[in-house]
Amino acid sequence: GLRLSEEKTVITHINDGFDFLGWNLRKFKGKLIIKPSHKSMKKITRKISEIIKENQTATQEILIKKINEVTVGWANYHHSSCAKKCFHTLDHRIWEMLWRWSKRRHPNKNKHWIVNKYWKEHKGRKWTFMSDKNILFLMMDMPIVRKGQISLNKNPFLDREYFECRAKRHRLNRKRAMNSNRAAQMGYYAL
């Protein structure tokens, strides 16, 4: 039969919450709230920090490409949860790391020179870390997608059209997510 691991199994109240697969699940004011766990946020922050440290002498183009590979995938994984505040927090942490990276590269230049070299105005945002070809993906631009509930009065055997339509929508959303992830891995994030 099924055996539960003693060290991995935790019994907790839903109001206290628990972490599972990078998410924190908790009931708050009668509603189930699912958001990225603190452990998951620390892990991606550490990973991006390592990328920046490993690429201290790399061009801005290469750095943007490597960071986008990680952030687009992470944002796609968490975009169906309550992640907007987490996305904003991580974008701010990445901005701070990139500011330190740019100051280390040019210790004798003033901040205005550094800003003009690495940050440009793009779509109304003055502080966009971008090169001539690439732009840093901001997780807060990722739309939060709420999953629709299945209608309880539908029968999968009788209402085939309803379930086929749901499946088609699901396939299209997965394809869109895969394409945006693939583009980021290739270093293309549209300007």
Range-by-range predicted roles:
Residues 1-191:
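Non-catalytic terminal/accessory segments
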